[in-house]
Amino acid sequence: MMEFKDFSTGLYVAAKFSELTLDALEELQRSLRVPNPVPREKIHSTICYSRVNVPYVPSSGSFEVASSGHLEVWKTQDGSTLVLVLDSEYLRCRHMYARALGATHDFDDYTPHITLSYNVGPLSFSGDVQIPVVLDREYKEPLKLDWADDLK
């Protein structure tokens, strides 16, 4: 049972992907000549970034969560971030599960995606991508508000 103090730590939940998916994503980064690519071991998809902790139970099992997506560049505080936006009902449902448990979300909408680079500078990328995105596992940990420091 969770105690009151447990709710104040925040919660981060993410999906990690199969070796085959990681191979395909690295090949995509290389073929596009993506500057500052996210390293293989850091590639993930955020499911929940909540300022309150909730009793989220990570899913187990390995299965395809998306078969396609498209590239977008998002303007962020730190520059231009290249993401592969996924058409994933599974990731949307897992996010809604966290919200149903009381998790917070800082944005109007949840957009399932995989970040390919946190800084592509002035470059632009677009287009549809066919990649089998296979879940390896979900994991959860206390929320780190200074997560960007880990990228340096």
UniProtKB/Swiss-Prot annotation:
* Catalytic activity, reaction form: 3',3'-cUAMP + H2O = U[3'-5']pAp[3'] + H(+); 3',3',3'-c-tri-AMP + H2O = A[3'-5']pA[3'-5']pAp[3'] + H(+); 3',3',3'-cAAG + H2O = G[3'-5']pA[3'-5']pAp[3'] + H(+); 3',3',3'-cAAG + H2O = A[3'-5']pG[3'-5']pAp[3'] + H(+)
Q: Which Pfam families match?
A: Acb1
Note the effect listed for H113A: Complete loss of catalytic activity
The intrachain disulfides are none
| InterPro entries with a match to the protein in the record | Acb1-like_C, Cyclic_Pdiesterase
Q: Which GO terms describe its molecular function?
A: hydrolase activity
| Keyword terms | Hydrolase
Q: Which residues bind 3',3'-cUAMP?
A: Y12, E141, W147
The record ties this protein, via SUPFAM superfamilies, to:
LigT-like
Protein residues bound to 3',3'-cGAMP: Y12, E141, W147
Active site feature: H44, T46, H113, T115
Which domain of life does the protein's organism represent?
Viruses
- Family recorded in the similarity comment: Belongs to the anti-CBASS protein Acb1 family.
The job of this chain, per UniProt, is described as: Counteracts the host CBASS antiviral system. Phosphodiesterase that enables metal-independent hydrolysis of the host cyclic di- and trinucleotide CBASS signals such as 3'3'-cGAMP, 3'3'cUA, and 3'3'3'-cAAA. Does not cleave cGG or cA4. Besides evasion of the CBASS system, might also enable evasion of the type III CRISPR systems that use cA3 signals.
Q: Tell me the protein's name.
A: Anti-CBASS protein Acb1
Q: Which organism is it from?
A: Enterobacteria phage T4
The gene that this protein is the product of is 57B
